[in-house]
Amino acid sequence: MSDQIDVGWSAPPFGLDQIDKGDIRVIASGNDAAVFKGQTVRVLITNAQALQMKKAVFDRYMKAYRETVDYMYADPAALKIYADFVGISEEKAKRTRDGFFPRQSIDPDRIVGLDTIVNDAVTLKYTAAPLTKDQLAELIQIPPH
């Protein structure tokens, strides 16, 4: 480290050793921002044509995705697999998962703060006007379990 002030962005487990040694510090994370706690910021998307033509494929994908997320948070063996794959300790793998990727943040069935998201889309000029309930229903299609 150069003893200069620098700001960066990182995704754990990168940087955890430096945090532990006191070489760097976390001054804020996305989990600290109230705006992110009140709205969904991660989604899985496809286009309408692909969804229409391959709906069964997407349904199977979502089933597997949900099973994988459940496994990641329920079975300690998942931490060992991740730790071995990344080359870190199981403790660090658990810290990465629990501290930086809370289960609810990767839940594909959880959409929160839709009113705020729609208003932000207009304010930030992603869309000219708020979407109607029918448009939102067409846009957000969560496959059944």
What does each model-found stretch correspond to?
Residues 52-127:
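Secondary-structure end/capping motifs
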Residues 1-82:
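Pocket-lining segment of extracytoplasmic ligand-binding domains
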Residues 18, 35-37, 100-101, 137-141:
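Short secondary-structure boundary/hinge segments and terminal tails
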Residues 29, 93, 131-132:
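Residue-level detector of family-conserved "landmark" positions at structurally sensitive sites
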Residues 17-20, 44, 99, 120, ...:
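Preference for short coil/turn "hinge" residues that link or interrupt alpha-helices
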Residues 46, 53, 108, 138-144:
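Generic structural "secondary-structure junction" signal
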Residues 121-145:
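Conserved C-terminal helix/tail region of periplasmic/extracytoplasmic solute-binding proteins
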